[in-house]
Design a protein with these regions (language model features):
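Acidic, metal-coordinating catalytic segment for phosphate/diphosphate chemistry
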Residues: 1-22, 93
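Conserved Nudix-box catalytic region and its N-terminal flanking loop in Nudix hydrolases
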Residues: 26-66
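Structural detector for helix-capping/boundary residues
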Residues: 47, 61, 74, 124-127
């Protein structure tokens, strides 16, 4: 059982803090996004830190779990937090996230959905981005301003 699910048993839907990692996979100037099953919105592959993990281990695990991809290198680009990283899930769970954004490099594997967290996986260009989950929108705005997705 995940750490967050264990905590939720004790606090219900009350707001909680969570640290996690989000992984940018950029191929041919397009970014990989996933349509999330829990929110039915597009986001960036990633998830919560588990007990004993480093953030780069979280990035590697989440990338593999959600996309079946692996990367040799994970470059820490930025850490996001604050009011923009509050989220209320459809089930009522409230979360304040601290999110480490990584860029994955030297990627291998066959892109496919490997867990129940994603409904679709797709690469999008800067000018064709779908409506995004609120935290992903903040992150991608930062990514575009940095010139990482041209």
């Amino acid at each position: 059982m995940s750490y967050i699910k264990e905590i939720r048993k004790h606090i219900g839907h009350a707001p909680m803090l969570s640290a996690g990692a989000t992984v940018l996979v950029i191929k041919d100037r397009k970014i990989l996004l996933n349509l999330r099953s829990d929110t039915n919105t597009w986001g960036i592959p990633g998830g919560a830190l588990e007990l004993g993990e480093t953030l780069d281990q979280t990035a590697a695990r989440e990338l593999k779990e959600e996309t079946n991809l692996s990367a040799v290198l994970f470059h820490l680009l930025h850490v996001f937090s604050g009011p923009d990283f509050y989220f209320k899930y459809p089930n009522g769970d409230e979360l304040y996230s601290v999110v480490a954004l990584f860029l994955a490099e030297d990627i291998s594997g066959e892109l496919r959905i490997t867990d129940g967290e994603s409904v679709k996986l797709r690469y999008f260009g800067k000018d064709e981005l779908p409506v995004l989950e609120s935290r992903a929108a903040v992150i991608l705005s930062w990514v575009i301003k940095q010139g990482l997705l041209s």
